[in-house]
Each structure stands twice: as C-alpha cells, then as structure tokens.
C-alpha cells in the first residue's frame, strides 16, 4: 500500500526503522521521488529542489539498499 509523506524529517525517521528494506530514487526534470519500502507500506516523498534531493540522498542510512531509476 502506498502512502505519501510530506515532511523530510518524517521520511528520515521511516528510513531508520528496522523494517525499511530499500529506497528507489526516481529523478525527473522537475522533481525527485524517494520511495522507501517498509514491511507494510511503500512511502513516497517528492522533493522539487535538486540540491535538497542530493542532501537527502547523502543522509540516508548506510545499511539501506539504494537504487536509482531514471
């Protein structure tokens, strides 16, 4: 089941959970989508600023599998 997250802080909290498995990053011309797979939900965060997206990508937990989709 998908759920959209509006705040970056909430997304980082979800990324640090034990049941978080993988993150897919989808880049567009206008925005970047971060999709994190947890056991029950697929959480999505849409970031419109490319610099913020790069900072968020670097602040993801190191044990998480990151896959970039174009």
From Swiss-Prot:
Keywords annotated in UniProt: Ribonucleoprotein, Ribosomal protein
Keyword Ribonucleoprotein assigned: yes
InterPro entries hit by this protein: Ribosomal_eL38 (IPR002675), Ribosomal_eL38_sf (IPR038464)
Pfam families listed in its UniProt record: Ribosomal_L38e
One CC-aspect GO term: cytosolic large ribosomal subunit
Gene Ontology MF, one: structural constituent of ribosome
Superkingdom of origin: Eukaryota
Annotated GO biological process: protein-RNA complex assembly; translation
Family: Belongs to the eukaryotic ribosomal protein eL38 family.
Name under which the protein is recorded: Large ribosomal subunit protein eL38
Organism: Anopheles gambiae (African malaria mosquito)
């Amino acid at each position: 089941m998908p759920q959209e997250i509006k705040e970056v802080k909430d997304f980082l909290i979800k990324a640090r959970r034990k049941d978080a498995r993988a993150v897919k990053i989808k880049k567009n011309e206008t925005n970047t989508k971060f999709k994190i797979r947890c056991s029950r939900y697929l959480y999505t965060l849409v970031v419109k600023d490319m610099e913020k997206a790069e900072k968020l990508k670097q602040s993801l937990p190191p044990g998480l599998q990151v896959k970039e989709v174009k």
